């Protein structure tokens, strides 16, 4: 939990700038979410497709048998560290980011992860096109071989890892 704030502290002088435009704020959050989720898709897919990484690292997350919001925290430390690279890549690509954008990014990601691991049928995300809803993620936890995206299910469609089961 301390890794993300420490990372922000390290790069704060490089990327954090004062807030001055709502439009830029919206563009920043959209770009960060897309880049982070693209990274997450490929990292998550690698964790499943590489037998060593799955058996030694990612299987820990899939050992949680009953959906519970805190299950998203149930991961190997290396998976946590590598998972944090996505937003930092986005921050560095953008070059300048508002602190408010980073705060909203964290709120969205944490609430989304709590939601998709809640085991509750449907969610607020079903109203957003291409959003990864609870049922979608539940299929991933049930079958393990598809549905690697998190926020945006279109990655699975684009890269042909979507399945109706």
Each language-model region and where it sits:
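Alpha-helical transmembrane segments of multi-pass membrane proteins
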Residues: 29-40, 104-113
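Alpha-helical transmembrane segments and their lipid-water interface positions
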Residues: 3-4, 40, 48, 117
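Helix-boundary and loop/linker segments of multi-pass membrane transporters
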Residues: 17-22, 58-62
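Transmembrane alpha-helix/helix-exit interface in multi-pass inner-membrane proteins
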Residues: 9-10, 34-53
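Specific transmembrane helices
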Residues: 1-17, 25-37
